[in-house]
Amino acid sequence: MYQSKKVLLLGSGELGKEVVIEAQRLGVQTVAVDSYEHAPAMQVAHNSYVVDMLDPEQIRTIIEKENPDLIVPEVEAIATDELLKLEEEGFHVIPNARAAKLTMDREGIRRLAAETLGLATAGYEFANTYDEFIQAAAQIGFPCVVKPLMSSSGKGQSVCRSEADLESCWETAMEGGRVKNGRVIVEEFIPFESEITLLTVRAVNGTAFCEPIGHVQKDGDYIESWQPHDMTEQQIEEAKHIAKTITDELGGYGLFGVELFLAKDRVYFSEVSPRPHDTGLVTLVTQNLSEFALHVRAILGFPITEITQLSPGASRPLKAPEELADYTVEGLENALAVPKTQVRVFGKPITKAGRRMAVALSAADSVETARENAKKALDQLILK
């Protein structure tokens, strides 16, 4: 029997699904774990489990049972303290348990970037209570950005433009966080010209970068991305310096999604994820190796010899307007008729308001055409 490596994913969404597919292409046995049944990666993995991802005992039980070669976190909300213990016992966490813990919430990584590494970031304060939040907002000034320390896909984020918004912004953060009634970060509002993701790969042969990905966010969640994003040479060098500094500090092998603000005067660090990034779905149609293929090669210890941009491209996610227990995705025939366009339907068991259910991906001779075509394709898709 073929003796393959075993990879266990903690988190089994649409990004994890692509990781599983790429791992299987290299003969890897895959195990998908998440908090709900029939998650996207579970549909293609060799084995799967449903657990409370924040319960250390449940996480340990599955890992000890499966004894994987690699533990690959695909979401933030995991019992990371248990991963630290498991790593000490000899299990291999990607990129490492410290990075998983630091990036689990916004406080650890922000303090590391700004206070330890001295990277340029927006000004920030933290608050545990509503009274502390009022004081933090007053200190940062208006407008300011309010985020729960732990959330996914931008849930719970809002812009607080004046004192009149304080109560609603606090409630939004409390409702949107992974941990209810949790801590929040209040950030200075940076008047940026654009937001980018710089996909950064740490592999056995060094650090490599993908072309920058531009994106548009709404309520903290991406609604469009494109690659490449036009930047000056100085901006590119500054972005690469920031990305290499933060990823070198985190260490380990794998792909990191480094989010940055481009302002007139400088590049600001925003966040980093030690895993494939949602805005990077566009690389499925733009690069010789997608972000998922790069991640898998790097974590398996293979060198990254080249990353080639094959074409400009763009992505547009389909988000559910409401919760539906039973649904279909209509309009695929028309969406797929758009030139050089693909659609990936994630197959999530139910919809929830704002949940990503599919993505339109378009390649073209220019970013502008790709963005237009991705929008055309998305406009054909309807959830019913």
UniProtKB/Swiss-Prot annotation:
The keyword Nucleotide-binding applies. Pathway: Purine metabolism; IMP biosynthesis via de novo pathway; N(2)-formyl-N(1)-(5-phospho-D-ribosyl)glycinamide from N(1)-(5-phospho-D-ribosyl)glycinamide (formate route): step 1/1. ATP binds at R106, K147, S152, S153, G154, K155, G156, Q157, E187, E188, F189, I190, E195. It is an enzyme of class 6 (ligase). It catalyses: N(1)-(5-phospho-beta-D-ribosyl)glycinamide + formate + ATP = N(2)-formyl-N(1)-(5-phospho-beta-D-ribosyl)glycinamide + ADP + phosphate + H(+). PROSITE patterns: ATP_GRASP. Keywords: ATP-binding, Ligase, Magnesium, Metal-binding, Nucleotide-binding, Purine biosynthesis. One of its GO terms (cellular component) is cytosol. Mg(2+) binds at E259, E271. One of its GO terms (biological process) is 'de novo' IMP biosynthetic process. Disulfide bonds: none annotated. GO terms for molecular function: ATP binding; magnesium ion binding; phosphoribosylglycinamide formyltransferase 2 activity; phosphoribosylglycinamide formyltransferase activity. Its EC number is 6.3.1.21. This is Formate-dependent phosphoribosylglycinamide formyltransferase. It comes from Bacillus subtilis (strain 168).
